[in-house]
Amino acid sequence: MALIEDAAFTRIKNRVGKAIAEFDLISEGDRVAVAVSGGKDSYTMLHMLETLRRRAPVRYELVAINIDSGYRGYRADIIEEHLREHGFTYHMEKTDHYDIISEKRRPNSSYCSICARLKRGTLYTLAQQYGCNKLALGHHMDDFIETLLLNQFFVGSLKAMAPSMLADNGVTTVIRPLVYVPEKEIIPFSRNNRFPVVCCCCPVCGTADLQRKKMKELLETLERDNPLVKKSLLTALSNVHPRHLLDKGLTRKPS
């Protein structure tokens, strides 16, 4: 089934195209591994990258990669059916991440951070196996802003995410094409196109990341007074004035 090319489609496509152009996310000849979890964000990213691939002046390839972490009830088959029906090149990877997490996790600690690290490592490995020099992740605008606030409020660091960065393996470049796409646009777009959203089935999903939930609630409160607050916070990430910060490493004069 083809995507519904309505106003929402055009807005998201334009935002993704803008991000690719501004941050040089995809170049001629790139082979991009696209992490597809089965959530609304990764489906949206995959379909937008494919839409642009067919229309863009540069040639690039996509390989959809799904990681099954081994949580009971996870329906990887539904994701695979969607990928197959839409003609994507894809790879489904079954792992024992859940068993590793259950063994290594400290009491009362979150599954999320360990799970994310394991998934990321597997994605890097598979990207290399499939000859991909880029790995696309489905973090949207709200994720960037929430991460900025989380680091400020709970870590004491002025840090968010990068739209493009070289991974720790020194080989794969991680890209985030949804940086300009707000979650509120993805939700109806995913619903209207009937993407078969699959829950990760983590036993603590929806309860572990309470700090991020607090940031979401804070932003919702701020938006009621200032509807442009998210746009302003995202703009701040590209409008940095080092002389007005306290990090001596940023203001130290060269010797």
Swiss-Prot record:
Residue numbers binding [4Fe-4S] cluster: C112, C115, C202
Enzyme class: transferase
Matching InterPro entries: Rossmann-like_a/b/a_fold, TilS/TtcA_N, tRNA_Cyd_32_2_STrfase, tRNA_thiolation_TtcA_Ctu1
Cofactor(s) required, per the database record: Mg(2+); [4Fe-4S] cluster
Cofactor: binding comment: Binds 1 [4Fe-4S] cluster per subunit. The cluster is chelated by three Cys residues, the fourth Fe has a free coordination site that may bind a sulfur atom transferred from the persulfide of IscS.
Domain of life from the UniProt record: Bacteria
Binding partners and assembly: Homodimer.
Xref: NCBIfam families: PRK10696.1
Additional facts recorded: The thiolation reaction likely consists of two steps: a first activation step by ATP to form an adenylated intermediate of the target base of tRNA, and a second nucleophilic substitution step of the sulfur (S) atom supplied by the hydrosulfide attached to the Fe-S cluster.
Protein name: tRNA-cytidine(32) 2-sulfurtransferase
Organism: Citrifermentans bemidjiense (strain ATCC BAA-1014 / DSM 16622 / JCM 12645 / Bem) (Geobacter bemidjiensis)
GN (gene name): ttcA
